[in-house]
Amino acid sequence: MTKNLRLKTGKTIDETYKISFQFNGSTYYGFKGDTLASALLANDVHLVGRSFKYHRPRGIMTAGSEEPNAIVQLHDNTSRTEPNVRATEVEIYERLKASSQNCWPSVNFDIGGINNFFSPLLPAGFYYKTFMWPASFWEKYEYFIRKSAGLGKSPTQPDPDIYEHKYIHCDVLVIGSGISGIMAAKTAAKNGFKTLLVDEKPNLGGSTIYQNSDYFKINNQSSSSWLEKEINEIKKLDNLEIKTRTSVAAYHGYNFLLARENLTDHLPVEQRKGKTRHKLLKIRAKKVISATGSIERPMVFDNNDRPGILLSSAIKKYADFFGVACGEKNILFTNNDSAYETAISLIQKGINIEAIIDNREEVDSKLLYEVEKNNIKIFKGYTVTDTFGYKRINKISIKQLSKDGQNVVGSKINLSCDCLGVSGGWTPAVHLFTQSGGKLKFRDEDQTFIPNTHPSDQLSIGACNGDLTLDEILKSTPNYLKGFLNIKNTEYDGLEIISSTNKSKRNIWLLPSDKVLGKTKSFVDYQNDATAKDIKLALREGFRSIEHVKRYTTTGMGTDQGKLGNMHALGIISETAGAKMGELGTTTFRPPYTPLTFGTIVGRNVGEYFDIFRKTPIHSWHEENKAEFENVGQWKRAWYYPIENENMHQAVQRESKAARESAGILDASTLGKIDIQGTDASEFLNRVYTNAWSKLAIGKCRYGLMLNEDGMVYDDGVTTRLGENHYIMTTTTGGAANVMGKLEDYLQTEWPELEVYLTSVTDHYATISVCGPNSKKIVSKVIPNLDFSDESFPHMSFKNAKIGNINCRVMRISFTGEHSYEINIQANYGKSVWEKCMEAGKNYNITPYGTETMHLLRAEKGFIIVGQDTDATMTPIDLQMDWIVSKKKYDFIGKRSLYRSDTIREDRKQLVGLLTDNPNEVLEEGAQIVADINKSPIEMLGHVTSSYYSPNLNKSIALGVVRGGKNMMGQKLIIPMEKKNINVTVADPVFLDKENKRLNA
């Protein structure tokens, strides 16, 4: 039976609306307005999760988006389930189901908790050190390390919810609805600015809305009462739009911001049907006012992570907002006045406070004196040295601090408690400010970073600007607004203010302990289990940059992005390394500020891409003949043609044998085709390709290689001269659009003097390739009035012809190494001509083949595929294609780069053939190639680019790139795989018919 810690009053909850929900399979009750965190605390549930590395028990620590511990899984169905959700931001609804993450079999008994006992083996960077020996065991270690990675479970079914995007334009965007944000929004709206006010919470007012003691007054009213009236007034303003439950995720340049508006997450699931869940707001504002507030800092001391340890401000909010006591025996631990505000609020509600520990020795504070009137014991100049209790704190130990704060002295005092509130000061929430390009400065007096240089048309006000007390905010905000909005006065000039906060603070980043050095666990990052000891270890091991320490220790790399711990990490680095905090800088604040669902990012752009599928004129024939398809760029290309129960390997073996032994037919319509005309067409090709084109005769074809300006292979294809000033160029399928754009760019910007006209005709023609020993016999039947003799129609030539009354072009070119012809005909006749070829080849067992067989056939011949056997680092020389680079031409694109010292190195990766010792063993494409697996570290020489089993050679073949490969012919190399090492021999990349006898047969 759980306790009920609900108080009689709570500002935001509706006690007439009772809600049942489940957590870890148990049913609890809360009220409308509760968050999951407040409802669990009301039911005396503090243990909600386990930490990432050590699986230590973790409890609710905050009341907002900075929560590092209470990260839960929502829903239990496979489509709507959502991991890593902060319980502090989940508004409960009827039949809500939530569960703890990162624990098994349960949060109360987690087998992973054994990690805590082995923590000496798991320090910062343990994955680089602890499990490195013996090396042969790494694969065993790796399995368990990977298995333990991650927190929650991702959905496995399609998301049933609806998401939208919306564009908003406004004169002034105000981020945050605390007291400064309300003042800014009202002032802007009343001065004629179209204003948008957004806040991540469901209610307006920030923390001031529950600052209701006599020690904080505005115009002789409690600050909360005054603010409530202001909120009621701004809701009536016509040119002010207010959006709650709206979190600004990203702040980009020129005042473009992304915000997520949460519309239905607080509703029961059955009420969400047909409604938009989240809306991604794309906001463009003329001016932006950041009033994002500040985040309370925890304290770093030994065992500061137990369930029941919360931020002092969170305890206050749960009491004031939700009517929840976080414990029955409360202790507060502080270094500033904020904890006394909490104490006064708890006293007013009858909540017991056992003691307050204040590490300041002398405090002159009205708030402290008020607390002392209630006979609450205050330990001045003390610190918490340890806490006790496994699943919930039950006791603390305290000791007096030395004068310099570096040690503890005197006797230990034990105090029992079930809740410890900590307050280590406040950190301005500058995350969005820095995303916008703003620059920070370090303020020594309160050891914090505040905005310094603002981008144009942006202003930071209130606590996020370093004004951390009520009187500072109320005095500075009107002046900032007058300057920023270019107005003469505001209604907030000359407010009467009572603010009793004493700004004195004793900041000690790492509080001392009475334990032996190194035996403590003082947590800096609660979610990732990064401790002060880890940070010091990183410094001892040579890390100095805050970004390096962050990554080595994983500090600030959890779902909370270090909102609580990063300042402490900086402070500990500063003290340990003897560096000034202002000189250390901060880690980079990256969007999103709080996590976004993929649904929010995608919006309505779900299902198939709007990007079209392109189909060849022969596509319907491929479908009728049961072809399997693959996507090549936008094209659907026939991949292979299985017969009966053939798998891909069997089909490809059959197709490739047929193409070599008799005849094969390929739909090559997807190749890019560019019609090139103009008096300077030949000169244009000379500049574009590496080889010479001026003397290419009409009716002849030539293979060309196109480079980038850096000398690296960009594309390839065959270009045919149709007339004196008329060519047709083919490109790779995937590169067609890019090549067309690149050529147009050169014509328009680099060579405008050339008279050349380019037209993309890819879709105009169907291209049918017939190859094999019987190809001539087949095309002779299809085009009987054309002379196909070798004398009349040699390799790399073309002829105009007619099939019936339809004009076509026939090229004798080959991508297989076989005697081959390509028929190019107007697209509408493509399928008809294909069927004629199939009919003509029936007696020769003509076999259609797809892209997979095409790849195998060209690899047997050593022909490259740009993008598979090349990347953006390969030159023609690397590909053993020196022959295609003209030595006579004055210039071509990329020529100068071919002679740089880097590109003429002999040890560059070069294309070679690879033959396995076991001819039946097929290498994996992408596999690394090494010479010596016993050398440490193993030197990677290259990788496999293409690999197949060749039925025509009865062995496996592969192409690869190897450093200095041209000079390694016949040498043995090794392909290290997961379970074995495969021995290979470096060979000529041309595996079949090097003399081209088949091509010219």
Residue ranges and their predicted role:
Residues 568, 575-707, 712:
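Acidic, proline/glycine-enriched N-terminal capping motif
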Residues 38-48, 679-696, 781-786:
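A short, contiguous, amphipathic alpha-helix enriched in charged residues
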Residues 445, 509, 654-661, 706-716, ...:
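Short amphipathic beta-strand starts and helix->beta connectors
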Residues 615, 619, 623-624, 637, ...:
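Conserved, structured C-terminal
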